[in-house]
Each structure stands twice: as structure tokens, then as C-alpha cells.
Curated annotation (Swiss-Prot):
One of its GO terms (cellular component) is cytosol. Keywords: DNA recombination, DNA-binding, Transcription, Transcription regulation, Translation regulation. Pfam families: Bac_DNA_binding (PF00216). The keyword Transcription regulation applies. Residues 56-107 are annotated as: Disordered. Belongs to the bacterial histone-like protein family. Residues 65-107 have a biased composition (Basic and acidic residues). The keyword Transcription regulation applies. This is Integration host factor subunit beta. The lineage of its organism: Bacteria, Pseudomonadati, Pseudomonadota, Betaproteobacteria, Burkholderiales. The gene is ihfB.
Length: 107
């Protein structure tokens, strides 16, 4: 599901929202989540999962073009850990074929 599909589904589910307002709501939420992660905070959405940061230590890598060894610096990367309810729901539906264009009604 893309951001625009999420906006469209939000506008469909809540008819009082025009598409512009739904887009603003989704953008505001994603911006707040991005800011929280950028500032080192953890985000927990009960029943869905949590977003946090994982530390990747520095290491010696290799330039694939020249073969030269290079130092890859330490970095922090976003990480999503699904909650129990989401894991169970995905597991229940794991045997069903994937629907390429169908929107999930239970968002």
C-alpha cells in the first residue's frame, strides 16, 4: 500500500474528510513519526507494533568497483517490530493468495 492509497482509503472510510484533509492527516502523522525517530525516540502503537532504531557498528567494507577496503562508519537505522496482534493476523492470512490491487478493509 502506498501513501496515496492510504490517503484514499482514509478519505473513503471517513466521508466528512475531503482528500486534501486526509492527505494532510497522513502527512502530519508520518512527519511526527519521522521526527520522533530522528530524535532517537521509540514509537509504540499497541496492537500494531513499534518503531525504533538499531545501531549498526562501523566495519571494514570493500569498494565493489576497485576492490579497495573502506571504513564504513557506524550508523543508526529505523527498525519495525510487529506487535502480537499484527503477527497473529498476518499468520492467519498467510495461506491465502496475495491480492495485488485489493485494499485491506480492516486498516
Amino acid at each position: 500500500m502506498t501513501k496515496s492509497e492510504l490517503v484514499a482509503q482514509l478519505a473513503t472510510r471517513f466521508p466528512q474528510l475531503v482528500l486534501k484533509d486526509a492527505d494532510f492527516a497522513v502527512k502530519t502523522m508520518l512527519d511526527a513519526m519521522s521526527d520522533a525517530l530522528a530524535n532517537g525516540h521509540r514509537i509504540e502503537i499497541r496492537g500494531f507494533g513499534s518503531f525504533g532504531l538499531n545501531r549498526r557498528p562501523s566495519r571494514v567494507g570493500r569498494n565493489p568497483k576497485s576492490g579497495e577496503k573502506v571504513l564504513v562508519p557506524e550508523k543508526h537505522v529505523p527498525h519495525f517490530k510487529p506487535g502480537k496482534e499484527l503477527r497473529e493476523r498476518v499468520d492467519r492470512n498467510a495461506g491465502e493468495p496475495l491480492k495485488a490491487d485489493a485494499a485491506d478493509d480492516d486498516l
